[in-house]
């Protein structure tokens, strides 16, 4: 899932991710 990877990379880069789901991750 390309969108999942994009979300994961974005959250990892910001070091501000909250949780990972089947659809990606939620940033807070």
Swiss-Prot record:
The reaction(s) this protein catalyses: a 1,2-diacyl-sn-glycero-3-phosphocholine + H2O = a 1-acyl-sn-glycero-3-phosphocholine + a fatty acid + H(+)
Tissue: Expressed by the venom gland.
GO biological process, one term: phospholipid metabolic process
Enzyme class of the recorded protein, top EC level: hydrolase
SUPFAM superfamilies membership: Phospholipase A2, PLA2 (SSF48619)
Subcellular location: Secreted
Gene Ontology MF annotations: phospholipase A2 activity; toxin activity
One of the record's GO cellular component terms: extracellular region
Keyword Lyase belongs to the record: no
EC number assigned by the record: 3.1.1.4
Sorted UniProt keywords: Calcium, Hydrolase, Lipid degradation, Lipid metabolism, Neurotoxin, Presynaptic neurotoxin, Secreted, Toxin
Cofactor or coenzyme needed: Ca(2+)
Domain of life: Eukaryota
Cofactor detail note: Binds 1 Ca(2+) ion.
Protein name in the entry: Phospholipase A2 2
The organism's taxonomic lineage, starting at the top: Eukaryota, Metazoa, Chordata, Craniata, Vertebrata
